[in-house]
A protein has these predicted regions:
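A short, well-structured edge-of-sheet supersecondary motif
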Residues: 16-50
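Active-site helix/loop module of the DD-peptidase/beta-lactamase fold
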Residues: 56, 75-115
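Second-shell loop/turn segments in exported
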Residues: 4-6, 93-96, 141-143
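Active-site SXXK
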Residues: 38, 56-81, 108, 156
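Glycine/charged-rich beta-loop-alpha catalytic/anionic-binding loops adjacent to active sites
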Residues: 44-53, 134-140
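Catalytic-site signature segments of enzymes, centered on catalytic residues
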Residues: 118-156
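Short, basic/aromatic recognition patches
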Residues: 4-22
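A structural signal for the main folded, soluble domain(s) of proteins
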Residues: 50, 60-63, 68-69, 89-94, ...
Length: 156
C-alpha cells in the first residue's frame, strides 16, 4: 500500500484497521482519496493499483447523485417533494400525463418514477436524456412501484 495520511484529517490507526478489516472479509480496495475544502489530505493506493488507472464506477454514480441532491436539499436549493415537471418544464412532452405530473424528485431518486422499466436504452438511442426520460410512458403512479433504473440517476 502506498499511502499519504497527513495532518489530523484522517485517523491513521482507524484507517489501517478499516483496511485490514476489508481484507479479512474479502473487500478489495483499489484506491482511497479524502478531500477537505477541495484539497487532497489523504490518499492510499493498493497494489497492483496506482491511482492512475481509469475505472468504471457503475452504480457508484447513484451515491454521488444522492449526496449532491442531499446537499442541495440541505441548502434549500431543492426539495425532494418538488415536481420534476416544475424543475424541468422545457424538457416535458407536449402532453404531460397524470402520472408524470405527480412525479417528484424523491420518486426519481428512489427508483419509483412510474416507468415500467429502465429507459436508459432509449436515452442512449435518442440523445436528449431529460426529454427522452419524461417522454417515456409513466405506467405506474410515481412513488408506488420500485423499478431499478439507472436512467433516474441521469435525471437527478
Amino acid at each position: 500500500m502506498s499511502e499519504r495520511l497527513r495532518g489530523s484529517a484522517v485517523n491513521a490507526p482507524a484507517f489501517i484497521r478499516f483496511v485490514k478489516k476489508c481484507n479479512e472479509i474479502g473487500v478489495a480496495i483499489h484506491s482511497f482519496r479524502f478531500l477537505r475544502d477541495s484539497e487532497l489530505v489523504a490518499a492510499a493506493d493498493f497494489a497492483p493499483y496506482t491511482g492512475k488507472e481509469k475505472m468504471h464506477v457503475y452504480s457508484l454514480s447513484k451515491a454521488f447523485t444522492s449526496a449532491a441532491v442531499g446537499i442541495a436539499v440541505d441548502e434549500g436549493i431543492l426539495s425532494l417533494d418538488e415536481k420534476v415537471s416544475e424543475i424541468f418544464p422545457d424538457k416535458m412532452p407536449d402532453v404531460i400525463s397524470e402520472n408524470l405530473s405527480k412525479a417528484t424528485l424523491r420518486d426519481i431518486l428512489t427508483m419509483q418514477s412510474g416507468h415500467p422499466r429502465c429507459v436508459l436504452d432509449k436515452i442512449i438511442e435518442n440523445g436528449d436524456s431529460l426529454k427522452t426520460f419524461f417522454a417515456s410512458e409513466f405506467t405506474y403512479e410515481p412513488g408506488t412501484t420500485f423499478i431499478y433504473s439507472t436512467a433516474g440517476t441521469m435525471v437527478c
